[in-house]
UniProtKB/Swiss-Prot annotation:
It comes from the Bacteria. Homodimer. Signal peptide: none annotated. This is Proline--tRNA ligase 2.
Length: 476
């Protein structure tokens, strides 16, 4: 059994896609369902999502947002109201045409996202500026009929959080859009240990129907980018289409200013590809379902299991801890919990008990140390923080070492062909250049970062005057 567990993971250097698939299966995060592209979230995978959800939910509620729930079905006529929006999602929509044996008078779309439902609701409940703002959030699943699927990264159905807010002024909606983006960025960095780049999407890459889309972008271990979260400012695009008006402070009718934003289980895919290694997952401690696992050595000997249980009682005051008292061998257990990425492993056997110590092993560095049992309650929280910082710094160094600055087309093509990572280059703002870089270099615009750099005066593609620096890259 242990041997099978060890040989199950393909090395990431040999086949990154297979390495990823091996991990999500062997670490028992997901299983495949009988419907193509739909995944079964197993207890370990769902516990990870619950921890992420709990943090995010608390942060949203602390900033005045309320949870609601909308239906999963959207009438076709409602979806058609915002032209750009429906065109953007049309290829991915799943339709319900029958109720039992009876054909429906109107097709129902299974929500790919819920803007239209929120808009219809807002149009009914808002009368005056006194009704604003409305700050709503929804936890749900959505369906997008993807052609190519991979667990967490791109699935037919996935879990997410989608926020929808309406405001009195353009300034308020813009502030909300950026505040949420900052919330997402701090969540990624402070809880998932994933460094992100904040910026704005180009017109080509923005959300269908949005006035502006902002994004956080992360770099995976194979050098590809992952759009980890987005925040959209709709302006009045949707409120005009759905007639969401209010009486302002002067008694005039105005359209509300609107935002939408979301993150999903795709973040779990990012977590795997940023921190994982050839032995399996490496869990960021703050969201790890189990932070400490205790493995009794020679547990059949008197006092060993009792001591492990006693230690668990102390540690559970400061961390999420479990004991594996199964009859599997210690070697099997070591491999199993390495695969699952549990941040800290404690080994305790008869000799350790004699010396009042345990063997502590870090998952991220494999470092072993002997530590007094009396120090565990104090040492473990500090070590979990240390592991988080180490993971973040390692990921940041990797990103920085795989970010390249170029000033001309040939240089950009050479880097894209020979390296993996982000490419920083100046851009004129023209769609034709963006499309040429996609076709001939194989990179898409990831974002126009808030932290701009002046690398050159000319566009990397056409040589005309550049307007901004853009991060480019291959992406999931």
């Amino acid at each position: 059994m242990a041997k099978e567990q060890v040989q199950a993971i393909t090395k990431m250097e040999e086949d990154f896609a297979q390495w990823y698939t091996d991990i999500v299966k062997k670490a028992e995060l997901v299983d495949y369902s009988s419907v193509k592209g739909c995944m079964i979230l197993r207890p370990y995978g769902y516990a990870l999502w619950e921890n992420m959800q709990k943090v995010m939910d608390e942060k949203l509620k602390a900033t005045g947002h309320e949870n609601v729930y909308m239906p999963m079905f959207i009438p076709e006529s409602l979806l058609q109201k915002e032209k750009d929006h429906v065109e953007g999602f049309a290829p991915e929509v799943a339709w319900v045409t029958h109720g039992g044996d009876e054909k429906l008078a109107e097709r129902l779309c299974i929500r790919p996202t819920s803007e239209t439902l929120f808009c219809e609701h807002f149009s009914k409940i808002v009368q005056s500026y006194n009704d604003l703002p409305k700050l709503y959030n929804q936890w749900c699943s959505v369906v997008r009929w993807e052609k190519t699927t991979r667990p967490f990264l791109r699935t037919t159905e996935f879990l997410w959080q989608e926020g929808h807010t309406i405001h009195e002024t353009a300034e308020e909606s813009q502030a909300e859009t950026l505040n949420i983006l900052n919330l997402y960025a701090s969540f990624c960095e402070d809880y998932l240990a994933i460094p992100v780049i904040k910026g704005q999407k180009t017109e080509k890459e923005k959300f269908a129907g949005a006035k502006a889309t902002y994004t956080i972008e992360s770099l995976m271990h194979d050098g590809k980018a992952l759009q980890t979260g987005t925040s959209h400012n709709f302006g009045t695009n949707f409120s005009e289409a759905f007639d969401i008006k209010f009486l302002d402070r002067t008694g005039k009718w105005q359209y509300v200013h609107q935002t939408s934003w979301g993150v999903s289980t795709r973040m779990i895919g990012g977590l795997i590809m940023v921190h994982g290694d050839n032995n399996g997952l490496v869990m960021p401690p703050k969201v790890a379902p189990v932070q400490v696992v205790i493995v009794p050595i020679a547990q059949h000997k008197e006092g060993v299991l009792a001591k492990a249980i006693e230690l668990q009682g102390h540690i559970q005051k400061v961390a999420r801890v479990k004991i594996d008292a199964s009859n599997k061998t210690p070697g099997w257990k070591f491999n199993e919990y390495e695969m699952k990425g549990i941040p800290i492993r404690l080994e305790v056997g008869p000799k350790d008990i004699e010396k009042n110590q345990v063997v502590l092993v870090r998952r991220d560095t494999k470092e072993k140390e002997f530590i007094s049992m009396d120090q565990l309650e104090e040492r473990i929280p500090a070590l979990l923080e240390e592991i988080h910082n180490s993971l973040f710094n390692k990921a940041k160094v990797f990103r920085d070492e795989n970010t390249y600055s170029v000033t001309n087309f040939e240089e950009m093509k050479k880097i894209a062909d020979e390296k993996q990572g982000f490419i920083k280059a100046m851009w004129c703002g023209e769609l034709a250049c963006e499309e040429k870089l996609k076709e001939e270099v194989g990179v898409s615009s990831r974002c126009m970062p808030f932290e701009q750099e002046h690398l050159a005066d000319e566009c990397v593609c056409c040589g005309k005057e550049a307007k901004q620096m853009v991060y480019w890259g291959k992406a999931y």
